[in-house]
Amino acid sequence: TKTNEFMDIRIENGIITKIAKDLTSETGEEILDLSGLTIAPGLIDTHVHFRDPGLTYKEDIHTGSLAAAKGGFTSVICMANTKPTVDSVDTLNDILNRAKVENIHIYQTASVSYGLNGEKMTDFDALADAGACGFTDDGIPLLNATFCYEAMQKAAALHMPISLHEEDKAFITNNGINAGETSAQLGVIAVSYTHLRAHET
């Protein structure tokens, strides 16, 4: 909203009913001094790992939801690199059904390829119809350019986003650092990054 102001907020039955400067308190209202705090619409995290199913000793849908809400995030997008991978409608439905009971909005991506192997494309149509919000082989680069381009075209035809984790691991000995002054000072082999964009003209 491009609005940063000091305001009073009235909340009734858990709903914000009024925002204005210098509201007059009503009889019986509880008044909280929130000086120094920021009130904003719910935040959205577009890249979370709830590790559910399969790796729930790290995180699960419920604990991830609680952590998100505690940090002010009311919507999250979960990555598809679970065990099993979110490459089938059954796995996607299981996650989305269990997510319904949580108090935040949980969206789930599906994988681009079966088993994150970068070889055979998942059924984008069926997964989109079942509620996938996008496609990603998160953490696994799609090194086959033809396969990657075909996946991008399919996602575009469905008006769905595709998220890529594109680095050639053969060039990277320490993930997360690009070639430059810092990598030279540290003596870390790194690689320059290139931003690739495919589009229709």
Predicted regions and their residues:
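N-terminal metal-binding scaffold of metallo-dependent hydrolase/deaminase domains
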Residues: 1-27, 200
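Metal-associated gating/positioning segment near the N- to mid-region
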Residues: 37-99
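Conserved small/polar residues in nucleotide/adenosyl-binding loops
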Residues: 194-201
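Active-site metal-binding motif and surrounding structural segment of the metallo-beta-lactamase
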Residues: 24-39
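Histidine/acidic-residue-rich catalytic or RNA/ligand-binding cores of hydrolases
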Residues: 88, 170-183
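Divalent metal-dependent hydrolysis catalytic cores, especially in the metallo-beta-lactamase
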Residues: 62-86, 100-114, 128-143, 159-163, ...
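Short, acidic/polar
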Residues: 58-65, 117-125
